[in-house]
Amino acid sequence: MSVSGLPFDDFRTLLRDLPGPDARALVAARERDAQLTKPPGALGRLEEIAFWLAAWTGRTPAVNRPLVAIFAGNHGVTKQGITPFPPTVTQQMVENFAAGGAAINQICVAYDLGLKVFDLALDYPTGDITEEAALSERDCAATMAFGMEAIAGGTDLLCIGEMGIGNTTIAAAINYALYGGSARDWVGPGTGSEGEMLERKIAAVEKAVALHGDHLDDPLEIMRRLGGREIAAMAGAILAARMERIPVLIDGYVATAAAAILKAANPSALDHCLIGHVSGEPGHLRAIEMLGKTPLLALGMRLGEGTGAALAAGIVKAAAACHSGMATFAQAGVSNKH
């Protein structure tokens, strides 16, 4: 516990002193890549992904224990009529994950990925952000700490995803608070909001950011006031992965909002992360650009559940396999360029 005892203090300390990449491992990976049986740069981003893996894991690129972590939370703001689905769907989908019936289950089977689902007090929705803070500082910090446990069982590639009715409204509010513009710039259909419902969603984001406006110069305050339990837990998981130098793939619009909190707190906080895909949610590409990232995939998906990050994990696994498994020119007896 920090000396002052304020719940966020330990996280502020971690964010000030983040570990960096392994320079030696990066050099070794680049040297090996130069000897593989291909022209320099011929594998495009696969080469950069292999270098990224080497730099953060400190070893030859390999993905042996990939894990998808899904964090599920409910939101008080849903009572504003901003989504066509009731909050009970969050719990029902968690049960669907457990039964193996969701899209993410099929992708995990196809790509041999582990899956963990974290139920974040679904019977107790966060505060309605148009009327009050989503969470107290203590509850938000405790949820971040809980999210950090995502890596406890061991992983060498963490895919971050979520489930929560109403959470694209939350993500829009966070992005609006961080980056400005207008609420309309950041609000999209989510699970199918349109017409008057979409207008209510925009109005809710505007009202929430206005209500909390005097406290939005601190990223962690943005998270606790405008966020949700899955936002806090994802931020905690990403931070825990950084402390252990575990590479991270971030999923869609909501997961990117959680990542944005960390980036706002420390500009280097997402150096160990890649964005798995750009979703069909209108604000996602702009949010990714604000992070200075380029997504690996663009498939028009907007499901959440970590599905885009999980699909991207297949690409990361292929990048590692190419780097580690390809023959060198000398091994293959192939002439290198003069």
UniProtKB/Swiss-Prot annotation:
Family, per entry: Belongs to the CobT family.
Molecular function terms, GO-annotated: nicotinate-nucleotide-dimethylbenzimidazole phosphoribosyltransferase activity
Main enzyme class: transferase
GO biological process annotation, one example: cobalamin biosynthetic process
Protein name: Nicotinate-nucleotide--dimethylbenzimidazole phosphoribosyltransferase
Taxonomic lineage of the native organism: Bacteria, Pseudomonadati, Pseudomonadota, Alphaproteobacteria, Hyphomicrobiales
EC nos: 2.4.2.21
Annotated Pfam families: DBI_PRT
Pathway(s) annotated for this protein in UniProt: Nucleoside biosynthesis; alpha-ribazole biosynthesis; alpha-ribazole from 5,6-dimethylbenzimidazole: step 1/2
Keyword terms of this UniProt record: Cobalamin biosynthesis, Glycosyltransferase, Transferase
Species of provenance: Rhizobium johnstonii (strain DSM 114642 / LMG 32736 / 3841)
Active site residues per record: 305
Function: Catalyzes the synthesis of alpha-ribazole-5'-phosphate from nicotinate mononucleotide (NAMN) and 5,6-dimethylbenzimidazole (DMB).
Catalytic reaction annotation: 5,6-dimethylbenzimidazole + nicotinate beta-D-ribonucleotide = alpha-ribazole 5'-phosphate + nicotinate + H(+)
Entry keyword Calcium: no
